[in-house]
Amino acid sequence: MEVRKAFMSDLPALLKIINAYAQQGIMLPRTEFEMAENIRDFSVVFSGETLLGCGALHFYGPSHGEVRSLAVSPESKQSGIGRAIVDALEEEARAQRLDSVFAFTYVPGFFRKLGFTEVEPGELPLKAWKD
């Protein structure tokens, strides 16, 4: 399985998977403009022309990053795609020399399995709470 950086041509597939989860109330919706503006944050996994999963690493200053918009297609759940994407985003965070990576999530158990721990809101960048 190859995790790669997203291209502008991936926008329709990204919007489809993210907004499908948003309609279920488990992810924030994204607009095409917002996605285009932040496309460099995204990593993806495809099988041929089919998007299997995506996730983004959004920077907050020089030392913090947030895993955002982590989504795996329903048919591909439990296949390791989510873990592979988070691993790639964490590798990117290390390459950028970030001190910490965090996630706001409706699925805390998944992130706990990957070694994330719950923290108090005051431990996160204030800007993250505003976004």
Please tell me what each predicted stretch does.
Residues E2-L14:
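A short beta-loop-alpha structural element at the N-terminal edge
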Residues Q78-E91, A103:
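Conserved acetyl-CoA-binding loop-helix of GNAT-fold acetyltransferases
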Residues M1-E2, A95-V101:
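Short active-site oxyanion
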Residues D99, T105-D131:
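Conserved active-site alpha-helix within GNAT-family acetyltransferase domains
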Residues V44, T50-H58, S63-A71:
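Conserved beta-strand in the GNAT
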Residues I18-L52:
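Active-site rim helix/loop that mediates acceptor-substrate recognition in acyltransferases
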Residues L11-A22, F59:
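Ligand-binding pocket scaffold of soluble enzyme catalytic domains
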